[in-house]
């Protein structure tokens, strides 16, 4: 009985070490490529009924796992162009570049289905802001070109092979600006988009 117990304990230790080794072989880096639908909240206090169009954009994120459960994620894309509307009338366009850095908690880091939550900071730079000549002449509009806000996130990675994952990700991001007319503040415009993304990830 003692020999059996000792043998069982030895097998248990070996299996445990094998599991740890298998987990250790999974690299700390995870790179995802996603198609993201950007749905703007369009909260406007200028009285002009400002809004920007919704669109689908490409996105790349790079995650580094500090522990099996905790990761830092940096989200990148190139400057995205949006049309600016007043009511239903197009009055201009702009580009925005919105890198976001988040800290994530992954609930089941060794399972096939790996849900996570995250929170972080978004920095958005607005550029190439243009208005149609009639609006430019009448209002001389300008905007604040930088925005800093919070980001909340929920998502899941689904393992489909050793290093390949399907990813579903949902974020709510605070993005806004101050609108000026002839040098005076006219109000605030908040994009505050809901971002729903689907893509693939590679772990290494």
Model features per residue range: what roles?
Residues 1-27:
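Cleavable N-terminal export/targeting peptides
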Residues 2-5, 10-12, 54, 62-64, ...:
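Domain-scale selection of a single, long terminal region
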Residues 26-27, 37, 61-134, 193-204:
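Gram-negative (and chloroplast) outer-membrane scaffold detector with strong preference
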Residues 32-34, 61-65, 153-155, 165-167:
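Short, conserved structural micro-motifs that define repeat-unit consensus positions
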Residues 33-61:
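N-terminal targeting signals for Sec/Tat export/insertion, comprising classic cleavable signal peptides
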Residues 42-52, 80-96, 123-146, 175-191:
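Flexible, solvent-exposed loop segments that connect beta-strands
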Residues 99-101, 118-123, 146-156, 172:
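Hydrophobic alpha-helical segments of small multi-pass membrane proteins
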Residues 159-204:
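Hydrophobic secondary-structure block in the mid-to-C-terminal portion of proteins
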């Amino acid at each position: 009985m003692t020999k059996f117990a000792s043998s069982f304990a030895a097998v248990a230790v070996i299996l445990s070490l094998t599991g740890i080794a298998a987990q250790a072989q999974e690299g700390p880096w995870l790179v995802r490529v996603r198609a993201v639908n950007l749905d703007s909240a369009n909260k406007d206090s200028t009285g002009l009924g400002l809004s920007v169009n919704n669109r689908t954009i490409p996105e790349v994120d790079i995650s580094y796992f500090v522990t099996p459960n905790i990761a830092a994620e940096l989200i990148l894309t190139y400057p995205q162009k949006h049309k600016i509307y007043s009511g239903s009338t197009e009055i201009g366009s702009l580009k925005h570049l919105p890198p976001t850095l988040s800290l994530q908690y992954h609930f089941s880091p060794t399972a096939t289905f790996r849900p996570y939550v995250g929170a972080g900071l978004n920095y958005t730079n607005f550029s190439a802001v243009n208005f149609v000549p009639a609006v430019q002449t009448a209002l001389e509009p300008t905007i604040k070109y930088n925005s800093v806000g919070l980001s909340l996130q929920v998502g899941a990675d689904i393992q489909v092979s050793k290093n390949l994952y399907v990813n579903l990700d949902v974020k709510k991001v605070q993005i806004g600006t101050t609108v000026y007319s002839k040098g005076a503040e006219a109000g605030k415009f908040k994009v505050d988009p809901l971002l729903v993304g689907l893509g693939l990830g590679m772990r290494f």
